[in-house]
């Protein structure tokens, strides 16, 4: 049995969100304020209904509020009804019997039977919210209230104190596990007798008897012979419940025998104590399921990365993924951790964004009707197995850095490190940083943008993750320009070769990638493709050649190259001196730009050194350096789309 679906309406910051869940592990991600904790609390509300002491309730402050614009006058509109609907699937025959008043039956497909429950809170006349519930598919049907006891959960909040919980003298989690073993073995009387025997030995000690006799001597002096008033001494609470709560975990120095002296948990790190607590909880769930196969257990953990370094986060994930193999138990985790997110399969990730929840694997399922084409030369439509393959590729591509795209407001996809270094510097020329707009720059280290795009290109806007996306790529026309016959020396020494190269670039055909990307874009207006004419470096050179040859050296880029490649810059100046006028034609500018482009060091070296030079001389760069227009357009799309 597992929680398969939830719909939350008008609860806290959520107006309406619905999502499906994985039977075992669910990682809920998203930026701050998107509703992750509200989803967890919505689950907790159901699992608290059957508890004698509820750890969570609904107050007037929990009803959703939103701003409404009425002709320029803004007012706050507060809802008066919270409704949360839960659907459970995978019930055993015994569970279907226990939850019979919850069941929605499909007579044709028994395997499609499911349990349904809705809870609601209504606020009237400012009074405390009125709780109500409905089970099954019939209005007004209410299962026996005691059935709510079959929904069991453990909750570890973001600001939890696991150390305190582990060392509590009442109802501590380790004591619960031990008590369960004791009950199963029917050994309560044996354990209580052990304590009674120990108590008898303790009470027979001279230190205890002398203390008792001293008190009685004083009482005799007070009462004389009027009242015979003496005390005895005993140790209270020899019950198993109190005995096991006195058993506390510690960290023994000898890890082989696990006995004798050791460190107190207060001396341990918060992160490691959190792990101990989680291990104990999972042990308790496993033992409870052995005793009773009817309840459903939910373990809800907020921000498990708290106090854990990245490697230990991954160890925790691997442990949780493997340890939660028990039927009838389910994990729900919220996280901001890119480390954790990068290792979790997409089927276990639920992204909260723009007021909706998206189970990420759904972006790669049941999309054949959209007739997606990735290779426009073959014009072959993608089938569901093709999309599943793209999902597997994406899971391999997403590392700690790339997983940050899921938490961003907008995303800039680029080909490589050169673009990453330069564009980060270019934004500073426009007086902002990418992080100011919560934009994530994703270096795909090549041109394999496609697997990422399927997250954001659904034809149905309701299903789409509607983040603004810009893709910056080269159109890579006339790739022969890399050959040695088009080196700087060849071009400057024989202008006919320069003329040929310019003509070849102008008449060159963009690679099919541009058409392919626009095809995969799938008419989604949140995605825009911005291609360079030729390459980024060619565009940088072209944008920084002034129309007037007299101003050639007044440009920030040219001045930089004059320092590192002074001889070549002098040759370009000599080449321009042959022009009949100071104002250059478009063709002359292009040829000068080609020569300037050919003075660049290697691609990576230029990006590394020039980006540093830009950052060190921002004010000078702002005065004369021109950022290629297609780059600015890509950045503008990301800002305007927010």
Report each predicted region and the residues it spans:
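Switch/communication elements of ASCE P-loop NTPase nucleotide-binding domains
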Residues: 1-48, 252-401, 420, 615-642
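Conserved P-loop NTP-binding catalytic core
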Residues: 41-108
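Flexible phosphate/Mg2+-sensing switch loops adjacent to catalytic phosphate-binding sites
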Residues: 48-75, 287-294, 327, 332, ...
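Conserved catalytic network of the ASCE P-loop NTPase/AAA+ motor domain
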Residues: 31, 75-79, 110-112, 146-150, ...
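Acidic, divalent-metal-binding catalytic cores of TOPRIM
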Residues: 355-642
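Electropositive, glycine-dotted interaction segments
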Residues: 83, 89-190
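Extended helical coiled-coil dimerization/tether regions that scaffold
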Residues: 165-169, 176-299
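Short glycine-/polar-rich loops that comprise or flank the Walker A/P-loop
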Residues: 80-84, 113-117, 149-153, 345-348, ...
